[in-house]
């Protein structure tokens, strides 16, 4: 089922309605934060997201800002989360609503035509292993946000565990894990041996304002954060980082350089929040 693809990245993921520190509902999900990342990276990029039609008006500013870069598909429900920040690197989360599942019909409706597809699951059930296999069969290289490995599809306080199907890893080319997710997956310290056991060719473990580690071919490279941005809430920072990282990898950047560019983008965007006080859809 392979076809001619163009160099670039298509981001697939569910929309989310976020309630942050008790504030009014705001747009969430990777689609709400990836646009600025794709623009910064340049090249071919597209975002396809799903959510209930009655919620689409909340995401109108996203479509107004990015135009044809963003496509929103209808679904029977929209993901929902509550986030309460303790500091720039720590927060408490709960699940208000479990979002739709991406299957063959949804992939065909999105119809990605880029060499890379970045999957941005909010919970473990968003992208089943069969969907990852389908994307691989279509000829795409697949990047995957590791919160989809560890986040259980359960309402209430967010539960993270390692009970993910092993075949979720089979068709991945890049796996991104936040520090807490890496600890869950490794059942302790995440090191080169754990990376080798997972079998994904390229694994990026992020440490918030401390930077990230990149595991490739048995080696580990540390990339420091571009600069620290303090006293700002960081919703969407991981989405921006990963979308920018994958877009730069699709454009031919080496892993370390892709991480540097992604880190610089996130720092710039977080600095903007110091002045506006909220995570605009970017």
List where the protein language model places each region.
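Short beta-strand scaffold segments in enzyme catalytic cores
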Residues: 36, 81-83, 211-215
């Amino acid at each position: 089922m392979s076809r001619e693809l163009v160099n670039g990245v298509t981001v697939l993921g569910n929309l989310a309605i976020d309630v942050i520190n008790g504030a009014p509902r705001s747009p969430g999900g990777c689609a709400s934060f990836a646009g600025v990342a794709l623009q910064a990276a340049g090249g071919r990029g597209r975002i396809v997201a799903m959510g209930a039609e009655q919620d689409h008006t909340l995401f109108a500013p996203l479509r107004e800002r990015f135009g044809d870069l963003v496509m929103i598909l209808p679904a029977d429900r929209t993901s929902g989360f509550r986030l309460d920040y303790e500091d720039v690197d720590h927060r408490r989360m709960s699940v208000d609503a479990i979002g739709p599942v991406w299957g063959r019909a949804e992939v065909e409706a999105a119809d990605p035509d880029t060499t890379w597809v970045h999957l941005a699951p909010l919970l473990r059930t968003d992208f089943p292993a069969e969907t990852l296999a389908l994307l691989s069969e279509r000829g795409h290289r697949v990047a995957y946000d590791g919160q989809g490995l560890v986040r259980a599809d359960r309402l209430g306080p967010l539960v993270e565990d390692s009970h993910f199907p092993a075949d979720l890893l089979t068709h991945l080319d890049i796996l991104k894990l936040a520090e807490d997710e890496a600890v869950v997956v490794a059942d302790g310290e995440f090191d080169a041996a754990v990376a080798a056991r997972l079998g994904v060719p390229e694994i990026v473990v992020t440490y918030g304002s401390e930077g990230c580690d990149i595991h490739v071919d048995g080696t580990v490279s540390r990339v420091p954060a571009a600069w620290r941005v303090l006293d700002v809430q960081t919703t969407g920072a991981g989405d921006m980082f990963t979308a920018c990282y994958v877009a730069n990898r699709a454009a031919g950047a080496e892993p370390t350089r892709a991480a540097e560019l992604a880190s610089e983008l996130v720092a710039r965007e977080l600095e903007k929040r110091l002045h506006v006080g909220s995570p605009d859809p970017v």
